[in-house]
């Protein structure tokens, strides 16, 4: 009895490779790392080393639900957005939501003119790194050689 393997599986609004193991396929979703992928598999009782495309439709639906609702399965310290400034809830954002939330956070810092916001708006380093020799922007100035001196003695 041969089992058909789907080449592409859609989970969390992302197309995943169905020929890879479940845990490693889940890491292709932005916001899901390897530790999170293994935790999801462990919570759902799915073998993380099974081939994703070989899973049943029910198991794939369970995975999709778990990826979207990780805040219900995992403790607060495991989530990527704790105490959201707008709602005050612990969330785990994935995909485009994660990118937009980070952009909104930076825009809010710029609007409030906090130290980090000012650094972001000036395009400088934000986390206290040195800026004298590293992180230089723009074209390289380069060095020009002087013309060789005319014949010697």
From Swiss-Prot:
<keyword id="KW-0689">Ribosomal protein</keyword>
<keyword id="KW-0694">RNA-binding</keyword>
<dbReference type="GO" id="GO:0006412">
    <property type="term" value="P:translation"/>
</dbReference>
<dbReference type="InterPro" id="IPR018269">
    <property type="entry name" value="Ribosomal_uS13_CS"/>
</dbReference>
<comment type="subunit">
    <text>Part of the 30S ribosomal subunit. Forms a loose heterodimer with protein S19. Forms two bridges to the 50S subunit in the 70S ribosome.</text>
</comment>
<keyword id="KW-0687">Ribonucleoprotein</keyword>
<dbReference type="InterPro" id="IPR027437">
    <property type="entry name" value="Rbsml_uS13_C"/>
</dbReference>
<comment type="similarity">
    <text>Belongs to the universal ribosomal protein uS13 family.</text>
</comment>
<dbReference type="Pfam" id="PF00416">
    <property type="entry name" value="Ribosomal_S13"/>
</dbReference>
<dbReference type="GO" id="GO:0003735">
    <property type="term" value="F:structural constituent of ribosome"/>
</dbReference>
<dbReference type="GO" id="GO:0019843">
    <property type="term" value="F:rRNA binding"/>
</dbReference>
<protein>
    <recommendedName>
        <fullName>Small ribosomal subunit protein uS13</fullName>
    </recommendedName>
</protein>
<dbReference type="GO" id="GO:0015935">
    <property type="term" value="C:small ribosomal subunit"/>
</dbReference>
<keyword id="KW-0699">rRNA-binding</keyword>
<comment type="function">
    <text>Located at the top of the head of the 30S subunit, it contacts several helices of the 16S rRNA. In the 70S ribosome it contacts the 23S rRNA (bridge B1a) and protein L5 of the 50S subunit (bridge B1b), connecting the 2 subunits; these bridges are implicated in subunit movement.</text>
</comment>
<dbReference type="GO" id="GO:0005829">
    <property type="term" value="C:cytosol"/>
</dbReference>
<dbReference type="InterPro" id="IPR019977">
    <property type="entry name" value="Ribosomal_uS13_archaeal"/>
</dbReference>
<dbReference type="InterPro" id="IPR010979">
    <property type="entry name" value="Ribosomal_uS13-like_H2TH"/>
</dbReference>
<dbReference type="InterPro" id="IPR001892">
    <property type="entry name" value="Ribosomal_uS13"/>
</dbReference>
